[in-house]
Amino acid sequence: MSGKGGKAGSAAKASQSRSAKAGLTFPVGRVHRLLRKGNYAQRIGSGAPVYLTAVLEYLAAEILELAGNAARDNKKTRIIPRHLQLAIRNDDELNKLLGNVTIAQGGVLPNIHQNLLPKKSSKAKASQEL
């Protein structure tokens, strides 16, 4: 008989990471370690790093999805900081969340004030109608 109370001779199950258990790609163990080392609280619950990792993974996926769409709109196959900037600034919620963030090499959104645009005159309309 084995010392662990199980059946004798049964193979031990391979260990599974917390990321794999939660179905995540981002590392739960690393986030847990960073929460402990960061002195955010005296104690860190076991569910907190899993939840935080899931939120971080979701945000990263959302931003990359929008940046990929921006890259495709510009006929590019590689995401550059400009595409990240366009993705974040054109999305209301992400822009609110990352409003104070500066993205290096991101540029600005194209915007021309209405007063600077050429005025539509009635003479131009009359000449077009003839």
Swiss-Prot record:
GO terms for molecular function: DNA binding; protein heterodimerization activity; structural constituent of chromatin. PROSITE patterns: HISTONE_H2A. GO terms for cellular component: CENP-A containing nucleosome; nucleus. The keyword Phosphoprotein applies. A motif ([ST]-Q motif) lies at residues 127-128. One of its GO terms (biological process) is DNA repair. Keywords: Acetylation, Chromosome, DNA damage, DNA repair, DNA-binding, Methylation, Nucleosome core, Nucleus, Phosphoprotein. The modification Phosphoserine is found at S127. The modification N6-acetyllysine is found at K4, K7. Phosphorylated to form H2AS128ph (gamma-H2A) in response to DNA double-strand breaks (DSBs) generated by exogenous genotoxic agents and by stalled replication forks. Phosphorylation is dependent on the DNA damage checkpoint kinases MEC1/ATR and TEL1/ATM, spreads on either side of a detected DSB site and may mark the surrounding chromatin for recruitment of proteins required for DNA damage signaling and repair. Acetylated by ESA1 to form H2AK4ac and H2AK7ac. The nucleosome is a histone octamer containing two molecules each of H2A, H2B, H3 and H4 assembled in one H3-H4 heterotetramer and two H2A-H2B heterodimers. The octamer wraps approximately 147 bp of DNA. In contrast to vertebrates and insects, its C-terminus is not monoubiquitinated. This is Histone H2A. It comes from Kluyveromyces lactis (strain ATCC 8585 / CBS 2359 / DSM 70799 / NBRC 1267 / NRRL Y-1140 / WM37). The gene is HTA1.
